[in-house]
């Protein structure tokens, strides 16, 4: 089964690589239109997944990721149209030179070929990945989690219908329709056809892919994100940023999970924080030192554990730790962070510069919410993933991350001497 999918994807990728930007954009517009026209079918399938997920006791955080609403589907279709407006990187000449030999050399962007994506309870990934791959002339093989089986199948069917109506091969976007884990292992070994693999899910999935895949793997998306409030921070502004980072969408991988507070301001800042968090329904997981200032506050507070610092909450929970100085804050991030998104709230330019230099994460912020780590917010369009590694892409992966390059040499009957 996967062998046939791989062959079909490879053939489709060759055809996609020949398309003009106009042809690709026309197909994207058709996909967006059909997603809206067939929204009832997709939403009905999503409700089946939601019912099954609730029966199986899925957490509220994961249920939120799984849920599609008419508004969310409309927003997703809008994102597909936004991809049309993005510059097509395929064919771009990255650099070029005329060599002493007389050879005129260019380095030109080309599609990767076939991309494999394995993801869990995130039905929006199906459309985001398909649109970005199509724009960059790549075919894609999708393997969604069993939680999103009905939604994914309905969505891919609509996408394939739109592709065929646009004169493109349906095999450009394929989905593995069985939740069998053995098929995941088979996909990881499909290096004959698949050029890059992207897992989007928990630590277990990432570990499996790193250990079992014979295909280059881009890992990331696990976001234990930190914000450090230094002694010079403006309290009101800091509390606004913290609230946004934690509350706007707690199930997102760029949501704030651990707050680090300088000891010089803890006695005044933490009671104010407690009031803000109580209003938002956030439970605080406090260290022993932080508990002194939070135990009588408005927000619910419990003792933090070592494991809490290492895991994503993906919910209205937040760790709170007091640090003695900037160095301790940075050391905490190095110890427990996942190199995703980390921030400092400060009025000191010196402290901001030092933090930015010392924290080795894909995205580092000064006086801004970690929620900005997103392809759309970065102006990249819908993202295929957020990479926390350094090769071959880092941070939100937009269109450029789905390309490679080839060298092209022009000569006039030129021979090497």
UniProtKB/Swiss-Prot annotation:
Pathway: Amino-acid biosynthesis; L-proline biosynthesis; L-glutamate 5-semialdehyde from L-glutamate: step 2/2. The keyword Oxidoreductase applies. Keywords: Amino-acid biosynthesis, Cytoplasm, NADP, Oxidoreductase, Proline biosynthesis. InterPro entries: Ald_DH/histidinol_DH, Ald_DH_C, Ald_DH_N, Aldehyde_DH_dom, G-glutamylP_reductase_CS, Glu-5-SA_DH, GPR_dom. Coiled coil: none annotated. It is found in: Cytoplasm. GO terms for biological process: L-proline biosynthetic process. Its EC number is 1.2.1.41. GO terms for molecular function: glutamate-5-semialdehyde dehydrogenase activity; NADP binding. It catalyses: L-glutamate 5-semialdehyde + phosphate + NADP(+) = L-glutamyl 5-phosphate + NADPH + H(+). PROSITE patterns: PROA. It comes from the Bacteria. GO terms for cellular component: cytoplasm. Catalyzes the NADPH-dependent reduction of L-glutamate 5-phosphate into L-glutamate 5-semialdehyde and phosphate. The product spontaneously undergoes cyclization to form 1-pyrroline-5-carboxylate. Belongs to the gamma-glutamyl phosphate reductase family. This is Gamma-glutamyl phosphate reductase. It comes from Photorhabdus laumondii subsp. laumondii (strain DSM 15139 / CIP 105565 / TT01) (Photorhabdus luminescens subsp. laumondii).
């Amino acid at each position: 089964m996967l062998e046939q999918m791989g062959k079909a994807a490879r053939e489709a990728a060759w055809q996609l690589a020949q398309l003009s930007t106009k042809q690709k954009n026309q197909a994207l517009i058709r996909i967006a239109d059909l997603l809206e026209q067939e929204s009832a079918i997709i939403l009905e399938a999503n409700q089946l997944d939601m019912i099954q997920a609730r029966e199986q006791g899925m957490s509220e955080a994961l249920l939120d990721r799984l849920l599609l609403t008419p508004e969310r589907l409309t927003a997703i279709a809008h994102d597909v149209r936004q991809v049309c407006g993005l510059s097509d990187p395929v064919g771009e000449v990255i650099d070029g030179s005329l060599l002493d030999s007389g050879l005129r050399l260019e380095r030109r962007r080309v599609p990767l070929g076939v991309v494999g994506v394995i993801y869990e309870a995130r039905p929006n990934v199906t459309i985001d990945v398909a649109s970005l791959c199509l724009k960059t002339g790549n075919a894609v093989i999708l393997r969604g989690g069993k939680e999103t089986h009905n939604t994914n199948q309905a969505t891919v069917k609509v996408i394939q219908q739109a592709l065929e109506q646009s004169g493109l091969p349906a095999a450009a976007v394929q989905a593995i329709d069985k939740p069998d884990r053995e098929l995941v292992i088979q996909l990881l070994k499909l290096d004959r056809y698949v050029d890059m693999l992207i897992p989007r899910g928990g630590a277990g999935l990432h570990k499996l892919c790193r250990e079992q895949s014979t295909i280059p793997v881009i890992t990331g998306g696990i976001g234990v994100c930190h914000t450090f409030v230094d002694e010079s921070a403006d309290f009101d502004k800091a509390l606004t940023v913290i609230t946004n980072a934690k509350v706007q969408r707690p199930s997102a991988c760029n949501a704030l999970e651990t707050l680090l507070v300088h000891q010089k301001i803890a006695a005044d800042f933490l009671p104010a924080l407690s009031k803000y968090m109580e209003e938002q329904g956030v439970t605080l997981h406090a260290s022993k030192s932080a508990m002194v200032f939070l135990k009588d506050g408005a927000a619910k507070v419990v003792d933090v554990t070592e494991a809490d610092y290492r895991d994503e909450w993906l919910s209205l929970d937040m760790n709170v730790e007091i640090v003695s100085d900037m160095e301790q804050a940075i050391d905490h991030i190095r110890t427990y962070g996942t190199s995703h998104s980390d921030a400092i709230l400060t009025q000191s330019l010196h402290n901001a510069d030092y933090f930015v230099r010392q924290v080795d994460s894909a995205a580092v912020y000064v006086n801004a919410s970690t929620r900005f780590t997103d392809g759309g917010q970065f102006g990249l369009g819908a993202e295929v993933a957020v990479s926390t590694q350094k090769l071959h892409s880092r941070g939100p992966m937009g269109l450029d991350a789905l390309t490679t390059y080839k060298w092209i040499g022009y000569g006039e009957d030129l021979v090497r001497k």
